């Protein structure tokens, strides 16, 4: 019974951070354009808006996919940071310029995640 109580209390506590998993499915042949846009523009603009990346990945077995994880203090902070990012004139220009030769992203899957109690990331 004590173990169940501890689990319930652990789950009831708010997490210190929320993590956002984002998976970008690119238009065929446009993965390199997306990676370049992230390297050259998106990452520095994220920093301006307190969007902290944990890492970026290109899966070995899934072509046309780009994956990254952001850390946010809360879901509310994530919403505010994304709104500021999307309205940033530097981002608007970078997106338009990078898509001058065609759309890059087909669709995005994203998930907000809380760390498990045994996770090294809290």
Predicted regions and their residues:
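An amphipathic, aromatic/His-enriched active-site/gating alpha helix that lines ligand/cofactor pockets
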Residues: 11-15, 36-54, 62, 71-116
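Short beta-strand segments enriched in hydrophobic/aromatic residues
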Residues: 25-26, 72
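Active-site-flanking beta-strand signature of metal-NTP-handling nucleotidyl enzymes
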Residues: 19-23, 67
């Amino acid at each position: 019974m004590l173990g169940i109580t501890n689990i319930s209390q652990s789950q009831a506590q708010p997490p210190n951070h929320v993590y956002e998993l984002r998976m970008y499915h690119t238009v065929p042949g446009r993965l390199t354009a997306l990676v370049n846009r992230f390297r050259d523009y998106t990452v520095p603009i994220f920093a301006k808006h307190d969007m902290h990346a944990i890492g970026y990945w290109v899966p070995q077995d899934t072509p046309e996919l780009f994956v990254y994880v952001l850390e946010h203090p809360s879901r509310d902070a994530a919403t505010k940071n994304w709104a500021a990012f999307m309205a940033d004139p530097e981002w608007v220009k970078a997106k338009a310029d990078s898509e001058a030769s065609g759309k890059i992203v087909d669709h995005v899957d994203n998930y907000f995640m809380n760390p498990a109690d045994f996770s090294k990331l809290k």
